[in-house]
Amino acid sequence: MASKLLRAVILGPPGSGKGTVCERIAQNFGLQHLSSGHLLRENLKTGTEVGDVAKQYLEKGLLVPDHVITRLMMSELETRSAQHWLLDGFPRTLVQAEALDGICDVDLVISLNIPFETLKDRLSRRWIHPSSGRVYNLDFNPPQVQGIDDITGEPLVQQEDDKPEAVAARLRRYKDAAKPVIELYKSRGVLHQFSGTETNRIWPYVYTLFSNKITPIQSKEAY
């Protein structure tokens, strides 16, 4: 078993179950799960320099550009250089992937593919706790009390961009941006693609992939 630090990435459109898979990987293998969305929210909330720059774009209804997200992630990764980590939501574009290349070699990339109809149904059942980013799904991860966050008791909201037309546009945007990233990692022999909708079905394969790279801290039965 190699003793080098593991550098892993998970790719997938919003609603593909990335967050759930990442949580299981982190729990079973002790990796740091670094979500670009979560880090962005934290920086917006605490008013860091990069958070303030991102806010200027978001207030205009614009996507946060590559260079801002890259700067956010690079500064976080600098502080995590002695840890195994798993990136979620980064790199989303070829420019971001090339920036990541500048600081490390990625060992393992998982790409989750999901049919549009499934994604549309799943996102329409999705409710979010805005301040923490916690996500609930009414079918397979419902809150204990409908419309209320389990931990804080604050109300949950549905996002505008979880509506079908918005989901279709997001999926197209994701695919257009992710295609060259997927091709890059495929050409390096580090990409593993999974199609389907059920985390439980793909989990044994994901567990095996990571087990070949890093010693588990608990068995795969620990869901």
UniProtKB/Swiss-Prot annotation:
Query: Under which EC number(s) is this enzyme classified?
Result: 2.7.4.4, 2.7.4.6
* Family annotation (Pfam families): ADK, ADK_lid
Which residue ranges does the record annotate as region NMP?
35-64
Q: Which residues carry this modification: N6-succinyllysine?
A: 60, 179, 186
Which body tissues produce this protein?
Answer: Expressed in kidney, liver, stomach, brain, spinal cord, heart, ovary, oviduct, colon, jejunum, ileum and testis (at protein level). In the brain, expressed in the pyramidal cells of the cerebrum and glial cells in the cerebellum (at protein level). In the heart, expressed by myocytes (at protein level). In the kidney, expressed in the proximal to distal tubule in the cortex and the outer and inner zones of the medulla (at protein level).
Amino-acid positions noted as binding a ribonucleoside 5'-triphosphate in the UniProt annotation, renumbered to this chain: 15-20, 126, 135-136, 199
Enzymatic class? transferase
Q: What is its main location?
A: mitochondrion
Q: Which UniProt keywords apply?
A: Acetylation, ATP-binding, GTP-binding, Kinase, Mitochondrion, Nucleotide-binding, Transferase
Source superkingdom: Eukaryota
Give residue numbers for the modification (N6-acetyllysine): 175, 179, 186
Q: Which reaction does it catalyse?
A: a ribonucleoside 5'-phosphate + ATP = a ribonucleoside 5'-diphosphate + ADP; AMP + ATP = 2 ADP; GTP + AMP = GDP + ADP; CMP + ATP = CDP + ADP
Q: Name one GO molecular function term.
A: deoxyadenylate kinase activity
Q: Does the keyword Transferase apply?
A: yes
Tell me the leader sequence span: none
Q: Name one GO biological process term.
A: AMP metabolic process
Segments for region (LID): 125-162
Q: What is known of its domains?
A: Consists of three domains, a large central CORE domain and two small peripheral domains, NMPbind and LID, which undergo movements during catalysis. The LID domain closes over the site of phosphoryl transfer upon GTP/ATP binding. Assembling and dissambling the active center during each catalytic cycle provides an effective means to prevent GTP/ATP hydrolysis.
NCBIfam families in alphabetical order: adk
The record describes its quaternary structure and partners as:
Monomer. Interacts with SLC25A5/ANT2.
Protein name per its UniProtKB record: Adenylate kinase 4, mitochondrial
Q: What is the lineage of its organism?
A: Eukaryota, Metazoa, Chordata, Craniata, Vertebrata
Q: Gene symbol?
A: Ak4
